[in-house]
Amino acid sequence: MKLSKPKYIFVTGGVASSLGKGIISASIARLLQARGYSVTIQKLDPYINIDPGTLNPYEHGECYVTEDGAETDLDLGHYERFTSITTSHANNVTTGKIYQCVIDKERKGEYLGKTVQVIPHITDEIKRRIQLLAQRKEYDVIITEIGGTVGDIESLPFIESVRQLRYQLGARNTALVHLTLIPYLAASGELKTKPTQHSVKTLLENGLQPDILVLRTEHPLSAELRRKVALFCNVDANAVMESIDVPTIYEVPLVMHRQHLDEVVLSKLDLPSEQEPDLSSLQAFVDKVKNPKRTIDIALVGKYTELPDAYKSICESFIQAGAVNDCKVKLHYVNSEKIDASNVGEKLGKMAGILVAPGFGNRGIEGKIEAVHFARTHRIPFLGICLGMQCAVIEFARNVLGFKDATSTEMDPATKHPVIDLMEEQKGITAKGGTMRLGAYPCSLVPGSKAAQAYGTTQIQERHRHRYEFNSEYLKDFESHGMKAVGANPDTGLVEVVEIPDHPWFVGTQYHPEYKSTVQRPHPLFVAFVAAALAGKDDKKK
């Protein structure tokens, strides 16, 4: 269906953070897609950083990279995984970007001597960014998730901008979905609605009346409680949704559909709901995730393992690849700083597969190299991503080629054997933010390689986030000793994929395959890696 002008859905959160606004936003998008509407989702983040590219993963979780090279919030990963929509720079807006743009305009004299203020200048820029996606004329519905919690000082300009937009666009062209928490007090055995009432009251104080409430809860909500929330929050009873904890986030669209959330949204937007959604493929996927035939143990070796959100896309890629292989991937997060030669067997010996995760810097690097060595010498299926691939190269150089001091110039600029080196175009760059090799680039695979077999083609395009690369001066040494470069950029020759052909499954990628794995198209490398781990597990039993 193609509308002449898009409709807008705004998603806010109250009571507490981390309730799942991104999951609800993605679920609404998936349901509207199933009804024939073209949808996109954007995230407004209230922090003053320009983007999360320089944020510590412990502060923010994963930095998700889009096809066009934007470093964005991890919620954009949810959007793409749920819907297979390709996002871009325009899908993630921060307070930092807004203020930077307004200040740049002021310096250029575009405000003609006016006093630059939050209202109207900041709010006007926010509204412009919200409506930027509409200029593509590709979407029927634009969903905008407002980061943070209603009542936060940082979110106020965004809330005011939404109020103005709803007024300007008209009541039938926008809908406001508010996600809140219904806490359970174990001492009294009660579910409490007061925090939700106060959250809605805070919204009302800022001029916004929610159209739909989604109530996060650990326990089922009674019809009476939902009627109470509807009455005191001034929301239609059929627009109060229960979002109870479920075994997998991919079940949330199905839970929302059973409560007719998509029908309520379409009604609020004055859109027809004639096409019944076909969610059979999603239901089949969820059934596989919830009812695996087998379990497989795979280690994720990294230095941010205390916060799994730092590797969110990798984790979700394994869930999707597990479903394809009718198994559950049990991820074991192993801190690379705590791995050495004396304990690597204890930590990784029972694993059916080992993934060495991406990262930056010297901390934990020797533990990652030790994990690579264990996977290579014990013939355990291995996948190295970005720095993980570079660690595979370093390990091979040290222990097979005999270059004992081989490393990356990131770790030791004076090394005699820089098998990983700073990219030529990066050598004059000093700024940190947004200056890496980012976004999608083409890659040509060697026919017959494990990577080409996994993809089913030799021409691929994958997303990147790095400054360092394989040093091609050493390529002949590596290939003559058994590590092959089986993927390269067709324009520059930059090595993108390495393999050890006589190993059961040993693949390293300079790019990030996890960024392109979705429910509808689980990434072929993860699917092949999990299949190899299962095969290796079966061989050990024989």
Language model regions located:
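C-terminal and late-domain segments of enzyme folds
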Residues: 438, 442, 446-542
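Flexible phosphate-sensing "switch/lid" loops adjacent to ATP/NTP-binding sites
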Residues: 1-330, 337-353, 360-361, 368-374, ...
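Cysteine-nucleophile active-site neighborhood
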Residues: 19-22, 26-30, 34-36, 347-442, ...
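Active-site proximal loops enriched in glycine and acidic residues that flank catalytic Cys/His/Asp
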Residues: 13, 43, 217, 244, ...
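Acidic/polar loop patches that form or flank catalytic/metal-binding clefts of enzymes
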Residues: 274-277, 383-384, 403-409, 460, ...
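Short beta-alpha connecting loops at secondary-structure transitions
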Residues: 59-67, 246-250, 356, 377-383, ...
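A generic structural signal for well-ordered coil/turn residues at beta-strand boundaries
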Residues: 5, 209, 236, 294, ...
